[in-house]
Swiss-Prot record:
UniProt source species: Campylobacter jejuni subsp. jejuni serotype O:2 (strain ATCC 700819 / NCTC 11168)
GO cellular component: cytoplasm
Annotated protein name in UniProt: UDP-N-acetylmuramoyl-L-alanyl-D-glutamate--2,6-diaminopimelate ligase
Record-listed ATP binding positions: G66, T67, N68, G69, K70, T71, T72
Reaction catalysis annotation: UDP-N-acetyl-alpha-D-muramoyl-L-alanyl-D-glutamate + meso-2,6-diaminopimelate + ATP = UDP-N-acetyl-alpha-D-muramoyl-L-alanyl-gamma-D-glutamyl-meso-2,6-diaminopimelate + ADP + phosphate + H(+)
Post-translational modification: Carboxylation is probably crucial for Mg(2+) binding and, consequently, for the gamma-phosphate positioning of ATP.
Similarity comment text for this entry: Belongs to the MurCDEF family. MurE subfamily.
Pfam families hit by this protein: Mur_ligase_C (PF02875), Mur_ligase_M (PF08245)
Signal peptide feature range: none
Residue interval(s) of motif Meso-diaminopimelate recognition motif: 346-349
Record keywords: ATP-binding, Cell cycle, Cell division, Cell shape, Cell wall biogenesis/degradation, Cytoplasm, Ligase, Magnesium, Nucleotide-binding, Peptidoglycan synthesis
Origin organism lineage: Bacteria, Pseudomonadati, Campylobacterota, Epsilonproteobacteria, Campylobacterales
Length: 427
């Protein structure tokens, strides 16, 4: 990509290099150093790039990493800070936003560094105080956050995912740990699988285990209602969000904001209660129909456990060209919670959907009770036809995604749109 300057431009791609342009050298493209020089480009690093783009180094960057909860936690911090009167930027799975305005569409969880610097340039122009970003394990291994100075770092949790990229769970865990070796402010989930971290400037949070930010009592009956203690402070979290996993997300979001800006606790409580959640995360898209992005065994278990008081009809699949070992585990978990399970297609990419579906099916013990419907629209239609008054249809895997990737082509597809179309046709 190119970023324009007054009389030149910055690029991270040697194919775009010209005489007198600037080539941003990163860990990923360093091997093309000689090619950039041959074309007459000036080699710069991230710090030099920030100066050329006149990025305000006073902007406080908050990074969130973990298997699940990154998107909701990032959105919660963004919303709370905006409600407290601060100017903020946000980038992650849902796209990029500055001061409540979307400036870029959905992309990678963590963008290439030059794209992130472009967002920070806009954040500077819009006089932002904070910039919140999701940080994936891929980005940590590929050093896509090099040169960024984080004011705060958050660890949500770690469970099996991305073994197609990391090879082993230990490699995946080590990738997450890379983020927490320095002395910056950090927030660590004490109830999650333990990771190594630098204890300097570390704040812990938890429900089950002793932590600096501790939940003392909570109710999840209608939304979330809880009391949080921290040293000599006590404040409430009251939220319409559902589930224990969202309690953790709101706990760390409030802890992070509390440490960074020291707000009046009544203002903090009001800002927390004003956060309505994220599209595609336990989102009720029609009466008795929930759509959620959960696509890992742990994520699926947390969502279904939250909804277990209802009779569940679960529509789900698994993405192609990704960790295959999690597929039977996903099936096993859905079987435990679902009245009816419908296995379908979910971004099969280069793989055959039927193969993925069979691998999910292998996790079921009572296979005769499972419906296999490859066409995702037909699978959703079947679930809605089978739904009785007290049932809850739960459609997992895509959340608010608007495409379905098959053989390298992204076709328009939205679970939410499909549900509403089917219900409209049913009258």
């Amino acid at each position: 990509m190119k970023l324009k300057l007054e009389n030149s431009f910055i690029t991270d791609n040697t194919l775009e290099c010209e005489k007198e342009c600037f080539f941003l050298q990163t860990t990923q493209n360093a091997k093309f150093h000689a090619q950039a020089l041959e074309k007459g480009a000036k080699i710069i690093d991230v710090n030099e790039c920030k100066k050329l783009l006149k990025i305000d180094e006073k902007i406080q960057i908050i990074g969130i990493t973990g298997t699940n909860g990154k998107t909701t936690t990032a959105a919660a911090i963004y919303s709370i800070l905006l409600d407290l009167g601060y100017k903020c930027g946000l980038c992650g799975t849902r796209g990029a936003f500055i001061n409540d305005e979307q400036i870029d569409e959905k992309s990678l969880t963590t963008s290439p560094i030059l794209k992130t610097l472009e967002y920070l340039q806009i954040a500077t122009q819009k006089k932002c105080d904070f910039f919140i970003m999701e940080v994936s394990s891929h980005a940590l291994v590929q050093n896509r956050i090099e040169g960024l100075n984080f004011a705060a770092k958050i660890f949500t949790n770690i469970t099996q995912d991305h073994l197609d990229f990391h090879g082993t769970f230990e490699n995946y865990k080590e990738a997450k740990e890379l983020f927490f070796t320095d002395e910056s402010l950090k927030f660590i989930n004490k109830d999650a699988l333990a990771i190594k971290f630098n204890v300097r400037n570390a704040f812990t949070y938890g429900i089950e285990n002793p932590a600096l930010y501790q939940i003392k009592a909570y109710s999840l009956e209608e939304g979330i209602s809880t009391i949080v203690t921290n040293k000599n402070q006590t404040f409430h979290i009251d939220s319409p969000l559902l589930g224990l996993f969202n309690l953790y997300n709101l706990l760390v979001a409030s802890a992070c904001v509390n440490e960074l800006v020291k707000p009046d606790l009544k203002d903090l409580e009001k800002a927390i209660s004003g956060f309505g959640g994220v599209c595609g995360r336990v989102e009720q898209v029609a009466k008795g129909v929930i759509v959620d992005f959960a696509h890992t065994p742990d994520g699926i278990e947390k969502v279904l456990d939250t909804l277990k008081n209802k009779k569940l009809i679960v529509v789900f699949g698994a993405g192609g060209d990704r960790d295959k070992t999690k597929r039977p585990l996903m099936g096993k978990i859905v079987e435990h919670f679902a009245k009816i399970a419908i296995i379908t297609s979910d971004n099969p990419r280069s793989e055959e959907p039927k193969t993925i579906m069979e691998e999910i099916l292998s996790g079921f013990t009572k296979k005769e009770k499972v419906l296999m419907i490859e066409d995702r629209k037909e699978a959703i239609k079947k679930a809605l036809e089978l739904k009785e008054n007290d049932d809850l249809v739960v459609i997992l895997g895509k959340g608010d995604e608007t495409t379905q990737e098959i053989k390298g082509i992204k076709y328009p597809f939205s679970d939410k749109v499909v549900v509403n179309e089917i219900l409209k046709n049913q009258g």
